[in-house]
């Protein structure tokens, strides 16, 4: 925040986009529970803050592909924000239009009228929290590995490894072909795993196998 504000104070006009797609999925007490968007909105007149949210993640409706965009800025009055909203609506109509209307309608109905909506959401959060905790402990057991280094993680659905100069795509293919494990290669040097889709009793074995696969390739 300090760095962004200092640049804004120098006279630069800044657009800052806050990716809040996983907002609310915080598993550690010390994790910041407020979005940077909140602070950016009131930080400086030269800052336009944009927040992207995703019901797909935050409401745990995987596959619905529902997103939201919110604008804020200290220098923007209602007239300016209304104009920006109309421009955004025009862009949406000219591109994706209302292609996800069924998903939007289903989610809205559940949020308004679902008798067990909050209870179901809490149950799913607790499930993700438990998987996260097991995943974190499993990764910590391999902290001395020279071939994979886990990036810090404390929220959301995923975690990732730095492949320490080796090819993440090579490891991805090796894990898929030999162990039927699916992972994502990010820019050739990062391998992402989704603990959200793994049963808790299989997470330890998953992590052990990923490290084993890396050792087979690079040691």
Regions found by a protein language model. Give the residues of each.
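Active-site pre-lysine segment of PLP-dependent enzymes
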Residues: 1-64, 68, 77
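Generic structural signal for small/hydrophobic residues in well-ordered secondary structure
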Residues: 19, 67, 107, 128, ...
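Short, solvent-exposed loop/turn segments at secondary-structure junctions
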Residues: 22-24, 55-59, 74-76, 112, ...
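Conserved core segment of the aminotransferase class I/II
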Residues: 41-126
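PLP-dependent enzyme catalytic core of the Aspartate aminotransferase-like
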Residues: 45, 173-219
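Conserved glycine-rich beta-strand-loop-beta hairpin in the small C-terminal domain of fold type I
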Residues: 101, 108, 121-136, 147-162, ...
